[in-house]
Amino acid sequence: MSLKYTCPSCGTPLGYEGLCWKCKCEQERQAALAWMPEQIVEKQRNLIQNIQRLADMEDPEFADFWQLLGYHDAITPEIQRAALAAEVFWPCEIYYHAPADVRDGLIHALLSAEYSSAASNLMSCLAMQGDDKAMETLLELERNPRPWRKGLYVDPSSYAQIGGWTFDKEGQKIQLNFDTCYPMVKGTTSEKSPVRIGRAREDTCPHCGGRMVDMLGLDGRDERLKFLGINGILTATCCPSCVGFLKGPAFNHFTLDGGVEIFPSELFDGAEKADCYVSPEDYKALTENPFVLGEAPVPLFYGCASEDVNTIGGFANWVQDAEYTTCPHCGKPMKYLAQIQWDTVFDCAEGTLYVEFCPDCHIVSMQHQQT
């Protein structure tokens, strides 16, 4: 059955009149990126005056917050102080690198908390603030748990990961993300780019028989990618159909000359075989997608403001909880590298692929999340 309408921007068949969701996201992003300085100030002022509406996920405050943070890095200490005064502790990103007085207010609230739900939100906020005193507080709570710890699933060191860092048993801080972010933008398949999403391979998946794909190929020698510390090529390879059905992430070892060794994997239900849900048309769309690395860096939360953006570095737009994989070789937490929104590379796909890597062991992990 053919659909009655098409998107006037990209031609995607639709069951309704108007823009498809991806073109609508792009339109909203371009409008937000074009805000004049006085518009940014007005939105900041409105957010301060109506900060409770942010916690209630009310627009325009909710949308304005994510666009101010993701596209302009414009969450000010005044906004953070207003949030603290109103006891708005969600979304936790509002407290990213907040000043010392706000940090101290968060610590006071956390150490006064009686219930696990409040402690959970406050530890997330403190993780986003992320300075040495924030770490000392979470470390102390890990070593000397409060009664509310029994109501939580994970330790404070896991909450720290929300802010892109954690600490080990000795109290040493470990950085889990990069303080630089680049977007993947639409170019052409023939355009030269140090990063490519979805490169076709000849080998097949042992579970479903579908084609394996280099989901991310990245040349760290490009000047824009020097911040990654990869002096060569990183390749992340998996089965696009089965990666969401594995017991844990997909792993591979990479060599700086572009080589890949794919690690064995198991399906989550213990089955030997699975159906392949990626059609030949989907493989074609995935391996011929036009994404190339953007020319200029963007704010660290650029990939968190919408669901149609693929990024290298910065922060991930976690569908569920922040999840940093443990390296299967050295046991250290891996560093977050990239996110690929499945629906940007072939139609009707759901969820996001998160790519992480161990710089020491040259091992990549790929994990899937969806609602």
Question: Where is each model-derived feature located?
Answer:
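Preference for intrinsically disordered or flexible, low-complexity segments
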Residues: S2-T371
